[in-house]
Amino acid sequence: MESVIFSINGEIIQVNKEIITASPYNFFKRIQDHHLKDEAIILNGINYHAFESLLDYMRWKKINITINNVEMILVAAIIIDVPPVVDLCVKTMIHNINSTNCIRMFNFSKRYGIKKLYNASMSEIINNITAVTSDPEFGKLSKDELTTILSHEDVNVNHEDVTAMILLKWIHKNPNDVDIINILHPKFMTNTMRNAISLLGLTISKSTKPVTRNGIKHNIVVIKNSDYISTITHYSPRTEYWTIVGNTDRQFYNANVLHNCLYIIGGMINNRHVYSVSRVDLKTKKWKTVTNMSSLKSEVSTCVNDGKLYVIGGLEFSISTGVAEYLKHGTSKWIRLPNLITPRYSGASVFVNDDIYVMGGVYTTYEKYVVLNDVECFTKNRWIKKSPMPRHHSIVYAVEYDGDIYAITGITHETRNYLYKYIVKEDKWIELYMYFNHVGKMFVCSCGDYILIIADAKYEYYPKSNTWNLFDMSTRNIEYYDMFTKDETPKCNVTHKSLPSFLSNCEKQFLQ
């Protein structure tokens, strides 16, 4: 019986010539055309046992592929050009991809030009980017490869601070490519992380590129009323889905988002004032009732800062209160601050540089009802008076933008809405052009380059150009609307001394 002789790494395999003749694959057809009878055909880059497995496949149309031998069989099948075995091997590898081997498979797919495996391994890296940073192969990714991964719209990061930590870990292994830091969008980062990067001697250039990472974009939480029950829904920019988080039967409450949880504060249930504060985790949808506030109240003003929820003023039955208190996220004790100079409800409160500003609202007793224009600032553990608003307003919505305050007023006694800018450093109010008039609830959020206003429609106000955009949107029955970025970055005053500890804490929190 005639045989064809193959030499692999010095080992000899004799193959029945009939198997070679019957083979439909190009490699063996070329052997039929050019093989000289007494010469051994030398095969380079192929494993001896993998070649035996291919010969078994040609004889019996069966092959034993496992996670342990798949790579060597796939390499042999590519070199010998046996497409059915290539497909079987690729399917096996894709089926077994996980966060611990996806970078290795990614590199393997590039080396041998396997598109399906490349796409599957890239998808695994994108979905598990924080986990794969622990792989020793992570630091060997090229600058262009990591840029492609982190620029993908579906990369699984929920805050730009996480992106920053991924880059810092890679830069530690690739110090000559520090300019990759410029893929960051500083406006989506916390001040703490920006300060840390600056202390490392790195400079992030102002980016004009569009934001591609959906996960760092603003989440949305909306509460809509229907038949006395309000439904809470959450929109994730990464999944692009709305999900129902739960329901609440409160009225006249306030709400705010802190550490990816929605807090629902005070208000009334069945026409009775309540002390309680409920919290729902927007990711797990789990509810928790946190410690009661110091008193029964509705129509409070709330703001958040440094992991704390602040509740200011409100209406205790028919009397406005000056109580100010805060609850640190994850704790169970309310801490009292000094009372407001003027008790009020329905005013606005906002943080600027760790100081609280409270403005407008209503002061009421059993005998009095006074619409306010005064402004108070809590700084150095006391309330002080600031320049009053140009007019008296019972309802005020306010946000901080670029170190100043922008306030929009509601309509009750007034005949129109007003837009003001409070210049903090000058203690000065100026009136700006107001694009619309709306009777009813409004919701105001600071969103990077613009301020979002939800009223009878969706409005975007751009402070730097003093211009407006209008978008049609159904706002019927909306009781609460907020946009937020997920923020779990450890808060601290970052200095050269505390920098290593801060970065270590961030790595433990974000990348492990």
From Swiss-Prot:
Gene3D superfamilies: 1.25.40.420, Kelch-type beta propeller, Potassium Channel Kv1.1, Chain A
Domain called BTB: residue spans: 2-67
Record-annotated membrane-spanning stretches: none
BACK domain mapped to chain residues: 102-176
Keywords annotated in UniProt: Kelch repeat, Repeat
UniProt entry tagged with the keyword Protein biosynthesis: no
PROSITE patterns tied to this protein: BTB
Residue ranges of Kelch repeats: 216-261, 262-307, 309-354, 356-403, 405-449, 452-498
Source organism, top-level taxon: Viruses
Keyword hit for Repeat: yes
Family: Belongs to the poxviruses Kelch family.
PANTHER family, sorted: KELCH PROTEIN (PTHR24412), KELCH-LIKE PROTEIN 8 (PTHR24412:SF480)
Protein name according to UniProt: Kelch repeat protein C2
